[in-house]
Amino acid sequence: VVKFIHQENVAVTTMTLTNKSAEDQAITVAADSIFATEPGKVTVNGAEQTELTGTCSSPAGLTTIYARMTGDGFEAASSDDYCWLSRDVTVPAGGSVEFKVVMAFTTEEIPESTEQYLRFAGLGNLEAVRAQKAEYNLYWAENLPYIDVPKKAVQKAIDYRWWLERFNSLDANIPGYDYQYPVTIEGVLG
């Protein structure tokens, strides 16, 4: 299992099931979220696949957040008004099966989140992980200045402050919000 969260609010979990026995093994894999419970369809790379969706309002009702979740070869399953993604998998003797689940929290104000959701849903496991790592490393190479200081503790503090500025900045420039200027709020995002 390899998990990552892309900077555009897209969470990806890649899985490889390996069967070391001499017989095929059949299992059912399920993925669910309290945020995405309505079944639907999404087109990924020209092919239709099952998707779960849901909506919720942001604090103070500033925008609507759309939860979207899909997985390779998954179908919707339900019971008592609750829905999840399910997939029957047969892992061949001595073989492996790969698949992934992708979930995103999208808004109309951040169209890149929808673009990245569809992009990662269409990539294979290895391609998805490689793409995320390359983009993550490039992001830091472009945004973290190189400052040479003799003490590692000072370097760590500098790196931390730059990380803090990049990931705890709030730019809430959406209609109806009174404070529409970027601000740094330490600790607000975790």
What is the meaning of each model-derived region?
Residues 8-10, 94, 147, 154:
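Active-site-proximal structural scaffolding
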Residues 113:
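Short, surface-exposed ligand- or partner-binding patches at beta-edge/loop junctions that are enriched
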Residues 129-190:
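Substrate-binding groove/exosite segments of carbohydrate-active enzymes
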Residues 3, 32, 55-57, 102-106, ...:
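Structured loops at beta-to-helix junctions and adjacent beta-edge loops in soluble globular domains
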Residues 1-85, 89, 116-134:
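Polysaccharide-binding surfaces and accessory modules of carbohydrate-active proteins
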Residues 21, 33-37, 105-109, 164, ...:
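Short loop/turn segments at secondary-structure transitions that flank enzyme active sites
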Residues 10-12, 25-27, 89-109:
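Short Pro-Gly-centered flexible turn/kink motifs
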